[in-house]
Every structure is written in structure tokens, then in C-alpha cells.
A protein has these predicted regions:
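Amphipathic, small/basic residue-rich leader segments at the start of a protein or domain
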Residues: 1-99, 120, 124, 286, ...
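A short, Trp-centered hydrophobic/proline-enriched beta-strand micro-motif
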Residues: 128-136, 180
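Internal helix-loop-helix
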Residues: 51-129, 170-176, 304, 311, ...
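A structural signal for short hydrophobic beta-strand segments in well-ordered beta-sheet cores
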Residues: 150-153
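Glycine-rich beta->alpha junctions and the first turn(s) of the following alpha-helix
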Residues: 7-11, 16, 205-308, 375, ...
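A short core secondary-structure module
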Residues: 157-158, 162-208
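Glycine-rich phosphate/cofactor-binding loops in nucleotide/flavin-utilizing enzymes
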Residues: 2-5, 9, 83-84, 104, ...
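C-terminal helix-coil-helix/basic helical segment that borders enzyme active sites and/or dimer interfaces
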Residues: 32-41, 283, 287, 291-294, ...
Length: 417
């Protein structure tokens, strides 16, 4: 922990804000509006720059504001994080480290990790020395996260992992991944899972980048061939993988809704997902006085404002116990709708200029539209979010499942004959 971190113990939010304002001005580069840094999720240089900026934040005493002090954070409340976020607007920040490294992986380790795992990995991430990712989805798994078939077998004092994962966000830039593995096939599917903290560059791990329709390659697929891990790589206990994964999903839904106290900075973590400037779009397309454009833009901006207030309301509800943890899916669901409305509105304003023409800003609208469905998939599909809200928030009856209570070895699966 830095000396600056120690000084925050008796500091008010306003005092903290003033100190952050002065420190940012002296230590972090300002973003030039017309030449913002290209912090793309699929570029190695972006991740290297993010690590450098994170090291500055840690040295200055502004890293991990809401993480406990004993793991390298400041141990402060979300009000301090919000104050820092407001002051950091307009400065170059390591935003791509937020999701999934801080808001999902480190948050999950904080909940269920061993003391050694928390001390080693949360601290290293806050120092800018480690990046963590999620290794959950599988090639034949679809939306059934509990149906994983990557195998973990006991061999002496170690675990040997074989199988494959896919759609792992930014795994190429990570040092470790939270990997969900099946370690017992003779119990129902949710009971036979174990979560491992797996080194990405470990012998036996092969990683490949996935090319997207918009030209990005931020997602990866991984193949595990006799990957040997020690007992201390287990997170949350053997056979407790579903409980760990559920905490990950809770934190992922909150992060997708921009409501995590572990997220540092205001804007999106990807340069291609920055807030849309409707005024600039109207100006570029010669529609400044178009009533229809004004109405569409107003609706999108209003829904974004409602989403932000909703996130605060649900966060406080979960914090004080008046709402269950599963209420995080409400944020996830509403933010997906708000984000898609924003992109639909931008595409409607840009019209054909989003796909043809010489204006790069308008062409970017078209590129972003191609990936509009991502917000309906991250943290589980929109349909899953609705089921979670229905069953775990509103207490509706659960849907019928043919494999409920059946040993996983007896469950018919794709390709199992």
C-alpha cells in the first residue's frame, strides 16, 4: 500500500476530490477531444498503455478505491469512487482494465477466493502487474453455462485439465483466467463443477484470436491439453464452481450496467463504444433543424439517464439488503435496451452514410451497429436475464428442466449420440 493510500483514512469525500483533481492534473495526460487515444480492446499496445497508467494510479494512491486496504486498495465507499470518476473525466485512464479484470474477476476473488489468492492477485492487478479474464463459454455450450464439458481430473497432488473455451474477452492480454471445469460427472450438472485460476501462458494452453465481422479480434478461444494445476489454483472449493460462477455472473451483470464500485473512470472501456454525440451526427448529416432527429436523440438520451439512476437505485438496494443479488440482472437488462436504442438512433440519423461515404465518424456508426447485439449477450443473454428476474427477484415458478437432478454423465448432450 502506498503512503498516499494511508492518508485517505480520515479524508472527506470533498477533500479526496480536491486531492484527486490536483494529482490528475500533474500526473495523467489529458485527452485531446479531436485526437482521443485509440484504446482498442484487440490491440496489444492498448493493454500495455493501460498497465502503465494503472501503475501510475497505484503509485499515486488512487487505485482500487473500493477494494480493501489489505489487498492494495483504499477501502473507501463508492462515493469516493464516484468523486474520482467525475474528476478523471477528460483524462487518459486505463478503462479497459475494468471489465472483466477488476469488476468481475477481482470482485469474485474478493468474495470467494482464498486469502492467498486475494493477497496475490488482487494486489497484483491493482499494481498494474496482472490482468485477469474469464474462461467460461464452450464451443458446444450455448447459453447453458452449467453444461461445461472441459474436464478436470485428479492426478496425484495436481489437477489435469483438458477441453476448450471460447468467446473469452481479451484473454490474449490476460495473465490468469477464472476457468470453469467439470470435476465430477456423477452428480447433477450444477454440483460437479470447480473453478480454477489458470495461468494463460501455462504449458498445454493454446490460444487463438477470433476475427469479428467489424474487424476486431478481442475475443479468443483456448484449448487445454493436459494442463496441470496445483490444489491452490482451486477457487472457492472443489465442487463449488457453480457458486463461484454465479458470483461472476452477478458482478458481470452489474459491470454491464455500469454499476460496479470497482470500476474506475467514467467512459466506456472501448474507444469504439464511447457515448454517441447526436449533435455532431446531426451537424455532419445536415439535420440540425430536423424535428424527427431531435425527438429520436432526446428519447435515447432520456433512456440513458433513466438507466444510470436505475443502476444507483438497484446498487443501494442490494447493498442494504432490500433487494436480492439477482436484482443486478435488472440493470443488465435495462442497459442492453438503452445501448441498443442509442445505436439504432445513431444509425437512423447517419442513414446510408453509415455504410458508404468518406466521413470516418459516420462510417464508425455503421461499424458499431454491426456489434449492437453484444450488449444482449454479455453477462448472459437478455432471455436469461429475464428468467433470472422472474425466478430470483419476483419469485415466479422455475421453468421445467429435463436434466434437473440427473447425474451429468446421463444427460444427453450435443454430439453424445
Amino acid at each position: 500500500m502506498t503512503e498516499a493510500a494511508v492518508s485517505t483514512a480520515q479524508e472527506s469525500v470533498d477533500e479526496f476530490r480536491q486531492r484527486a483533481r490536483a494529482w490528475l492534473a500533474e500526473n495523467i495526460p489529458r485527452i485531446e477531444r479531436n485526437h482521443p487515444p485509440a484504446m482498442r480492446l484487440d490491440q496489444d499496445a492498448s493493454w500495455q498503455r493501460a498497465r502503465e497508467l494503472q501503475k501510475r494510479l497505484y503509485k499515486g494512491g488512487f487505485a482500487g478505491i473500493c477494494f480493501p486496504r489489505k489487498y492494495g486498495g483504499l477501502g473507501l465507499t463508492i462515493e469516493y469512487q464516484k468523486a474520482f470518476n467525475a474528476e478523471s473525466a477528460g483524462y487518459e485512464m486505463p478503462l479497459i482494465l475494468n471489465i472483466p479484470s477488476f469488476t468481475i474477476c477481482c470482485a469474485t476473488l474478493l468474495d470467494v477466493g482464498s486469502e492467498e489468492q486475494k493477497t496475490q492477485h488482487i494486489s497484483a492487478a491493482l499494481r498494474g502487474e496482472e490482468v485477469l479474464c474469464q474462461l467460461l463459454s464452450e464451443p458446444s455450450g450455448g447459453s447453458d453455462l452449467a453444461g461445461v464439458t472441459t474436464r478436470g481430473k485428479r492426478r496425484g497432488d495436481s489437477w489435469v485439465i483438458n477441453g476448450a473455451k471460447t468467446w473469452s474477452t481479451s484473454a490474449f492480454a490476460a495473465d490468469y483466467g477464472l476457468c470453469l471445469v467439470r470435476t465430477d460427472w456423477n452428480v447433477p450438472k450444477h454440483e460437479g463443477l470447480t473453478m480454477f485460476l489458470l495461468p494463460i501462458k501455462h504449458p498445454g494452453v493454446t490460444l487463438r484470436r477470433i476475427a469479428m465481422i467489424n474487424g476486431s479480434a478481442e475475443f479468443c478461444e483456448e484449448f487445454f491439453d493436459e494442463v496441470e494445476l496445483p490444489d491452490d489454483a482451486v477457487v472457492g472449493g472443489v465442487g463449488k464452481g457453480w457458486q463461484v460462477a454465479s458470483r461472476q455472473m452477478f458482478h458481470e451483470r452489474r459491470s454491464m450496467g455500469r454499476s460496479s464500485e470497482f470500476s474506475s473512470g467514467l467512459e466506456s472501456d472501448d474507444a469504439e463504444a464511447a457515448p454517441i454525440d447526436y449533435l455532431d451526427l446531426a451537424r455532419r448529416t445536415g439535420q440540425m433543424n430536423d424535428v424527427r432527429v431531435a425527438a429520436m436523440s432526446g428519447r435515447a438520451l432520456a433512456q440513458r439517464a433513466v438507466a444510470e439512476h436505475l443502476a444507483d437505485h438497484v446498487y443501494q438496494g442490494v447493498l442494504d439488503g432490500s433487494m436480492p443479488d439477482a436484482a443486478g440482472s435488472i440493470i443488465r437488462l435495462f442497459y442492453a435496451d438503452a445501448s441498443q436504442l442509442e445505436l439504432d438512433t445513431a444509425a437512423a440519423i447517419a442513414s446510408t452514410a453509415a455504410v458508404v461515404g468518406n466521413d470516418a465518424a459516420l462510417f464508425d456508426v455503421g461499424k458499431r451497429y454491426l456489434e449492437r447485439q453484444i450488449v444482449s449477450l454479455g453477462g448472459g443473454t437478455t432471455e436469461i436475464a429475464r428468467n433470472v428476474i422472474a425466478e430470483r427477484v419476483l419469485d415466479f415458478p422455475r421453468e421445467y428442466a429435463a436434466d434437473r437432478g440427473v447425474p451429468f454423465s446421463q444427460v444427453r448432450r450435443s454430439g453424445s449420440g
